[in-house]
Structure formats: C-alpha cells, structure tokens
Amino acid sequence: MGSFLRSLRRDVGPPTPSVGATPAKKEPPVPPVTPLEKMLQDMGAIREDGSDKFFGMENYGNTCYCNSILQCLYYSVPFREAVVNYPTRTPIESLEAALANTLRYQNFAANLEAEALAEKQKAANAQRPGAPPNQPQKPEDKDSPEYKKKMALQTLPLLETKNNATSYGMSESLFTSLKDLFESVVASQSRIGIIRPQHFLDVLRREHEMFRTAMHQDAHEFLNLLLNEVVANVEAEASKQPEPERSLPPAESADSTELSGSSGSKTPNTTRWVHELFEGTLTSETQCLTCEKVSQRDEVFLDLSVDLEQHSSVTSCLRKFSAEEMLCERNKFHCDNCGGLQEAEKRMKIKRLPRILALHLKRFKYTEDLQRLQKLFHRVVYPYHLRLFNTTDDAEDPDRLYELYAVVVHIGGGPYHGHYVAIIKTQDRGWLLFDDEMVEPVDKNYVRNFFGDRPGLACAYVLFYQETTLEAVMKEQEQENMDLNTSVADINDSTLKQNGYPLSPGLAHVHSASQIPSPSEPARFSNLQRAPTAPPLFPHPEHADSESSPADPSTTASATPPVPPIPDIHSLPLSPKKSDSHFKKERAKEEKERKANEKEKEKQRRRDQEARIREQRREDAEIRAALEASKASKAEEDRRHSPDDTKKSSHGLSRLKRGSKSFSHRLGKDKENRVSSSSHSATPIAEHPPSRNGASESQQQLPNGQSPGSHGLHTRHTGLDEERDTLKDPKHDRSGHHGKWRSFSLKKKSFSILS
C-alpha cells in the first residue's frame, strides 16, 4: 500500500497550462492607506468653501518656511475668504476647467515600476568593470518622514498652479499668485493631494532678491513680508480703478454668504481687509516725572514680537512687554511742556486688538560673545485660549477672547539651519501636522510639546490666535467631552477615537492604543512604539497633575487612556535633507561651543571680580591717605589760628620785610658816615656774635609743644626787634661805626633766615 502511494505521488505532478489558456494577470499594487485617508473616510460631500481640503506642499529645497506660513494663512478662515473673494470670486466652472489641466493623478504601479527599473540600472552600473563597489543600502524606515513624503509624491494627486491674474483684472503679483493657490485648492474635487507652489516661489524670488538663494530663511520675516506685499498689491490695483468701480461690492455666492455669517468673515469690498484682520494699534504712553504730563503716540502692527524669559508663559511675556521703562541719563525724554530733556516713564499698551493675533516669540537673539544670532531654548508656555490684559482704558473690546488655531514650529539648533512645520486646528477635524508633503492628524495634547526646554528640541516660533466667544469655547469643550466619553464607553472597539475620527493602532502622531485594558488588569498596558516623525518634547506637567487629582469621571474622562510617551528627538532629522549622524555632529558641536562659551564667561567673571577687588582696595587706600592728610592739615590750620601763632606772626617775616626796607633806607641816608667809618671793625663783631650761635643756644632750651624750627624762627624775630629798638635809640646815632656793623649783622641775620 505504501509503495502504491509513493508511485502515485511520483505520477502526480504540477498542472501544466493548456496551450490556448491565457496566463493570470498580476494584481496591481495598492498604495497603503494613510492616517489622513482613514480620518476622511466618514466625510460627506465636498464643500465649496475649501474647509475640508487638506493638501501638502512640495519642498523645493529649504522652502519649508514658505510652506508652513501658507498653510497657516489658508486655514485662517476670514483671510482665505477675503483672498478668494477679492476683487471677485472666480466662477467654479472656470476653476474646474482650469484644474482639468493642472490636477494630475499619480499612477502608483507605474511609479513603482520606474523605481524598480532605476534600482536595476544602478545595480548594473555598479557591476561594470572599473566601477566603485556598490555600498549596501539600509532598508527604508516606513515610519520616517522621508519615506512618507516620498510615498505621498508617488500616490497623491499633484496640483500645479498657473498665472490667472488676467481673469482677476489685475497684473501679476504676489497677491495674485497667492490667490491662484487658494482658489486651486478650493475648487479641487479631491480632499487630499500635494500642491506645487512653483509659480508662487518664482514670483517671490523675482520681486525679492533675498529669497533667490537656497539658504535657510526666517518664517516670521516671510510672514511680515507677505502681509505687507498683499496690502501694497491690493492698494496699488485699487488706485488704478475708477472710483465708481471701487465702491461697488463684489458678487457673492450663496455658499460664501452662509460661510460669512457663520464664521464672522465678510466679503471684502474695500482694500483694508488685511488691516481689519491682522492690524492692531499700539499706544506708547510717556509720563514726564517733572511736570507729570502724559503724552501718547500710536503705531500699528501686523504681528506682535515679544521677548522671552526662561520658565515663563506668553502672559508673562506680554506683561513684560507692557512693563514701565525708566527714561533717564542718556535716554531722557524731551518734554514739550518743560522744554527740555527730562526723566520719564514709558510703557506700551494695546489700543486696538486685531481679529487675528500673530505672536512672534523671539527665539533668535544676537550675542556679543559669539558675534552671531543664537537660538533661545527657553520654556514658554502658551495657552489654548488667551485674553489680553495690557490694553488702554479706551480700547475697543478689551475683553476679547482668543483661541489658538495654528503654531509654526522651528526644529534645529540655530537660526541658520533647521526645519519648519505647522500644526493647525481645522474646523471639524481636529489638529493636523503639516510637514511639507506630509499631512497627518495629531492629538490636541500634541500641541503642548513645543514649549521648548533645551538645545536640540523643537520650539514654537509663531503663534496664531483668532477671536472667539465664550459660548463657542464652552460648546467645543462639551463636544470634546462627549467624544471622549463615547470613546471610553466603546471598550470592544479595536481603535480609540480622538477628535471624532477612528485611528489606526500604528499612527505615529496620535499615539493610539490597540486595546484599552480594564482597570483591574494594569499589567496589560503595553509600551507604545515611538514615532520618528513627531518633533518630541516632554509631556506637560499639568497633564500629570490632572491625572493624579480626583475628578468626576463624566467630565474628566481623559484619565482613563494613558498619555503616550513623546517620541525621542534624536529620531527626528534636523531637516528633510540631512541624516541623523549629521544632526548629531551639529548638536555635539553646538554643545561644545556652548560649554566653551560658558567656561570663558566664568573666567571673564573671575577676572572682573579680581579687578573689582583690586580697584576697591586701591580706592580704600586713597581714601585713608586722604583722611590722614585732611587730619594733618586740620591740625596745622588750628595751630596757625591759635593766639600765640597770631602774636608770633605779627613779629615774623612781615616785620622782617618792613625792617629790611627801613634799614636800606637808613643806610642810603648815612652813606657818607658809613664810608668814613670803614676802618672800625673789631668792636661790633665782639659785641654782636652771629645769629647761628644764638639760634643753636636757644634750641637747647625749647618749651614743650614747639618744634626746633618754629622756636628758632621766633628767636630770630626777637633778635631783630631788639636790634631795631637799639637803632631807634638816639644815643646810638652819635657813633657811625656802630650803625655800620649793626647793619652788617642784620644782613647776616636776614640771610640766615631766608636761607
């Protein structure tokens, strides 16, 4: 029996195809379903206002700054409606006819075949003699942003824009190219795709030379330039039109009218719609401290730039922005009332609040030590809802409430390199991450990951707030609680619903769980996989506090699902064109520069401290010497003004001068007598010895408290007085030789005193 079965197996072979049978066709590859497509599965009909379109933008080499700002402006509902409706809204039929040539759908199978053919060609070239050895390639990471962007370019529809300025009745400008972008997305019959903003970039680089290079640009500078260019283009075209045409309002469709009533936006019939949306008014109040007169000066702004402090919030930064500033010393204020420079106090307040508030966090600061800009990784907390307090007393609607709807994030260690992404809140589909060609849904708490802490982390750079009402905020919170309660109650589902749409277990940015374990089985919690596409930060500490504090499960259902770990920042490349190793090298270099800078600052601080100590010691020595000299001069001054000194000074040098003059006069009169008695010389020398001996004798008996010099001077003065008394005696006039030798003796004394 066994031999029969073995022979039967040998006889039975694989079935041979018949001669006339056709081979079975190979099934074409199906592109993978993206998380965005899963989110849009339950969407209804396509809207005509463009609020349900989610297109990525192709990066043409460091153009992420442009893509992130354009995405934020497109999802600013009143701004998008104003751009589309000015000067008139293009009919939808014309747009659909134009999109028939500009919207191109991808052939995924053809792209795969072309990619496989390119790989074979590359391998064949490597096998040629003399060719360098082919390096083994690592398998592609399907969770990396580069792979997702490549798949998006191969599978999603590509939308190219053309110049339609003539249909608007305007000349080509940056505004018309922006209008081309917005209208193409609004009129598209596909909800997802990729825009190619090549025409917009061509106009931008043609009109502004600074954007012609492939260097890293600043997103905030581009936002400010774009808004000012839109204002200039609109006003320039309006000035060319006659007055009656400018006064006529443009035609409105029923859909646009309905949207305007619901969102609060109006179809622009003037050229000031950009000012009405983004423009605010700042008031500079300056109070003179001399006359206490307050002067005010108004200035407009399209975005508000605030300085940052470590471990602060947007509210504290705004408080510092409006803090009082003392104008003194070289920065005094010229008061017109006082007519000169005076000390004053200055502060900045907001007089008119904009409908859309663009807050620029000044992350890049110029440092004198490095002689270049440096990125500040300060932790600055920004809220979902904001109410400004630094308004003037006569401000319009000072209690206006704002809600956060877009965040532009800068990823990188410095201002000269890095990458920009945008996180935007849509009307009814929650928050989305726009990373050039890739668009993915994220959770609401994901927005809180960009407060900023240390080098290497992604930080929020520009915050977009739009006006809202308290009723809308309460309604939104109720809807979020209802959605969260529904997701918690649906335990048997395999996916967790957040923001009202189902998510797959492998979604990187939403961090959804495949199964919610019961509270009685805590050991069944599994570690979630980390996603390299999300710029990570640590979870906000307030969330942990909310989990630890007891609350009502009906209102605080967020405690049931655990907060997923934030992905590691090392897995996110610095830019789409840079590898992880290059990013690590740059970060190590920046860390080394930072440590060297800190060490140099510490050395400089020590040197400055030693110099201050030496200077302080020198000043103390000078002060002590000055005090000693002051004491000595005070004692000398006291001795001079004493009664004895006054008496001595009356018989001092002044008397000597008068005596010398009288002697000279006397000698001039008795010249003949002195000449006739020149032979008598011995007797006066014996009677009047030199004054030196007398001075030395008197120095041996000094009274207490007198110096030898002062006593000698007093003795000499006394001798002079005695000689003058002797000369004044009439009996001395009889012998001329006494007068001669006494005069000689007086000259000797005068010489000794002067010497």
UniProtKB/Swiss-Prot annotation:
Query: Which residues lie in Low complexity bias regions?
Result: 547-560
Under the heading Pfam families, the entry gives: UCH
Q: Give the matching CDD domains.
A: Peptidase_C19G
Which residue ranges does the record assign to the USP domain?
55-468
Known catalysed reaction(s)? Thiol-dependent hydrolysis of ester, thioester, amide, peptide and isopeptide bonds formed by the C-terminal Gly of ubiquitin (a 76-residue protein attached to proteins as an intracellular targeting signal)
Query: What EC number(s) does its UniProt record assign?
Result: 3.4.19.12
Which biological processes are named by the entry's GO terms?
carbon catabolite repression of transcription; protein deubiquitination; ubiquitin-dependent protein catabolic process
Regions of biased composition (Polar residues) lie at 254-270, 693-709
Q: Which GO terms describe its cellular component?
A: cytosol; nucleus
Q: Kindly indicate whether the keyword Protease belongs to this entry.
A: yes
| Region annotation (Disordered) ranges | 1-32, 119-146, 237-270, 495-755
Q: Which regions are flagged for Basic residues bias?
A: 654-666, 734-755
Superkingdom, natural source: Eukaryota
Keywords for the protein's UniProt record, in alphabetical order: Coiled coil, Hydrolase, Protease, Thiol protease, Ubl conjugation pathway
Coiled coil, from the record = 581-630
Comp. bias intervals (Basic and acidic residues): 237-246, 577-648, 718-733
InterPro entries, per this entry?
Answer: Papain-like_cys_pep_sf, Peptidase_C19, Peptidase_C19_UCH, USP_CS, USP_dom
* GO MF term list: cysteine-type deubiquitinase activity
Active-site residue numbers: 64 (nucleophile), 419 (proton acceptor)
Q: What does this protein do?
A: Ubiquitin thioesterase component of the regulatory network controlling carbon source utilization through ubiquitination and deubiquitination involving creA, creB, creC, creD and acrB. Deubiquitinates the creA catabolic repressor and the quinate permease qutD. Also plays a role in response to carbon starvation and the control of extracellular proteases activity.
Q: Partners and quaternary state?
A: Interacts with creA, creC and qutD.
Q: Which family does it belong to?
A: Belongs to the peptidase C19 family.
Spell out the protein name for this chain. Answer: Probable ubiquitin carboxyl-terminal hydrolase creB
Source organism: Aspergillus flavus (strain ATCC 200026 / FGSC A1120 / IAM 13836 / NRRL 3357 / JCM 12722 / SRRC 167)
